[in-house]
Amino acid sequence: MRVEIDHRNSGGGKLRHPEKQHRPDNPIQRKPAWIRVKAPNHPVYHETRALMREAKLVTVCEEAACPNIGECWSQRHATMMIMGEICTRACAFCNVTTGQPAPLAADEPARVAEAVARLGLQHVVITSVDRDDLDDGGAAHFAAVIGAIRAAAPSTTIEILTPDFLRKPGALEVVVAARPDVFNHNLETVPRLYPSIRPGARYYQSLRLLDRVKQLDPSIFTKSGLMAGLGEDRGEVGQVMDDLRIADVDFLTIGQYLQPTVKHAAVDRFVTPDEFADLAAMARAKGFLMVSATPLTRSSYHADADFAALREARAARHAA
């Protein structure tokens, strides 16, 4: 069975992506066998889902219609999305709702921390929508969430996946000062495709953000991700890898882009598992500490095991 994507908001019947309704339809291609997944039905999946509902937390697993939700939630792994479920950007690839966000919930850091403690997570991934409406882009809220998790679950390692904080001076410094264990910011695609795929962002702003994290605190692991199958070529991907290595990024993820609705960017092609293996080999040769490149790779997929391997890889490199 395939996981079906909810294209509408629950209740009210409003379109989830009204800003995309003027765009022509892009038919959704049938997925090849190597990226089809079973519908989630494990008892622990339902327990995790119930806990998220009870704590009134949003997850990127649901909002972005992640194909790995069944596997991850069955292991009590969920990526929590803070600062609401409404994003101020309208990226052509993303299934998160676009619109005017609600004010920040002051109790959200405590609710996130409680959920992390109850799930007994060794490693947690926290992401967010873009909040261009806030003076600091939500930086102080990120810091508050990190602090609350440290207090409630001191042994849990924390990975954050942040927006670009475009035109938010001082915001990055606030987040880095909270000392997450991993700072992830996805470049998403190659520079040539930014105008059509990520129009609200700037490639070199994202690259500078990652570079600046390492300048501020070299002990923090940095991570970035790319989508494959949007029309990029191998040479362009190699150049992005080089840019990331110049910025001293430790961990690269590459996964297949999957089109959420007919109003989103079309899949240019489905990249084969062998091609992903080739990209992984190329990335390792360029010096990344860790690489995950498979059709179903997503930013937080297997993040707990990957973090343990990342620490071991750094220790081995320093010992060499």
From Swiss-Prot:
Q: Which residues form a coiled coil?
A: none
Highest taxon listed in the record's lineage = Bacteria
Carries keyword Transferase?
A: yes
The pathway where this protein functions is: Protein modification; protein lipoylation via endogenous pathway; protein N(6)-(lipoyl)lysine from octanoyl-[acyl-carrier-protein]: step 2/2
Q: Where does [4Fe-4S] cluster 1 bind?
A: C61, C66, C72, S300
Entry EC no(s): 2.8.1.8
Q: Which UniProt keywords apply?
A: 4Fe-4S, Cytoplasm, Iron, Iron-sulfur, Metal-binding, S-adenosyl-L-methionine, Transferase
Q: Name one GO cellular component term.
A: cytoplasm
Looking up PANTHER family in the UniProt record yields: LIPOYL SYNTHASE, LIPOYL SYNTHASE, MITOCHONDRIAL
Per the similarity annotation, which family is this?
A: Belongs to the radical SAM superfamily. Lipoyl synthase family.
| Protein name per UniProt | Lipoyl synthase
Q: Which organism is it from?
A: Acidiphilium cryptum (strain JF-5)
